[in-house]
C-alpha cells in the first residue's frame, strides 16, 4: 500500500455500488505470474471484492481495455471498452482499477527484444491503453483505488497523484 487517503478498508455500510475496472480485475493469468504451479483454487480481484461486499453492495465490472492492444476483440474499434468503463465509473460510488502486466508480457522465456512478448521492458510505464484507462478513471471524479498486478517495477507517479489509494 503506497497511498491511502482513508478510503481503505472499504466501508460496506456506506458503499452502495462498486465499479471494478481493468484488464487484470478478473484475470487468473495476472495472479500466477510466469513461474507457477497449479493452485487448487484461484480468486481474482473481482471475485474477492464480490465475496467481501456480499449481496448488499452492487458490483459493476468492465475490462476497460486489453493489456496492451488497442482493442479487446480483433474486429472491434480501437478503445472498444473505454466507454463501458466510463459508464461503470459514472454509476459507482467508488472504482477499483486493476491494471498491470501478466505472464504474457513479462518473463524470461520470451523474445528478449519484444516487450509485448515477455521480453525486456523498454519503459517502466504501463502500456498506453492502460494509461488511457487510468486517465479516464481519474477524470470520472469518483474515488479510485488502484490495484497493480505485476512482477516488475512500474512507474506509479500518475496514480499517486490522481488516485485515492494505490
Where are these regions (language model features)?
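C-terminal non-catalytic regions of proteins with extracellular/luminal or membrane-system context
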Residues: 1-166
Amino acid at each position: 500500500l503506497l497511498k491511502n487517503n482513508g478510503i481503505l478498508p472499504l466501508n460496506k455500510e456506506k458503499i452502495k455500488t462498486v465499479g471494478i475496472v481493468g484488464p487484470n480485475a478478473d484475470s487468473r493469468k495476472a495472479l500466477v505470474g510466469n513461474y507457477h504451479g497449479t493452485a487448487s483454487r484461484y480468486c481474482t480481484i473481482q471475485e474477492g471484492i464480490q465475496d467481501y461486499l456480499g449481496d448488499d453492495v452492487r458490483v459493476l465490472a468492465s475490462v476497460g481495455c486489453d493489456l496492451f492492444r488497442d482493442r479487446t476483440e480483433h474486429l472491434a474499434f480501437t478503445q472498444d471498452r473505454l466507454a463501458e468503463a466510463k459508464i461503470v465509473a459514472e454509476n459507482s460510488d467508488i472504482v477499483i482499477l486493476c491494471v498491470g502486466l501478466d505472464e504474457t508480457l513479462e518473463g524470461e522465456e520470451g523474445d528478449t527484444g519484444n516487450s509485448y512478448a515477455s521480453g525486456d521492458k523498454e519503459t517502466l510505464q504501463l502500456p498506453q491503453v492502460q494509461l488511457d484507462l487510468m486517465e479516464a478513471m481519474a477524470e470520472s471524479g469518483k474515488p479510485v483505488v488502484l490495484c497493480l498486478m505485476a512482477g516488475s517495477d512500474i512507474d506509479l507517479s500518475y496514480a499517486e497523484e490522481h488516485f485515492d489509494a494505490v
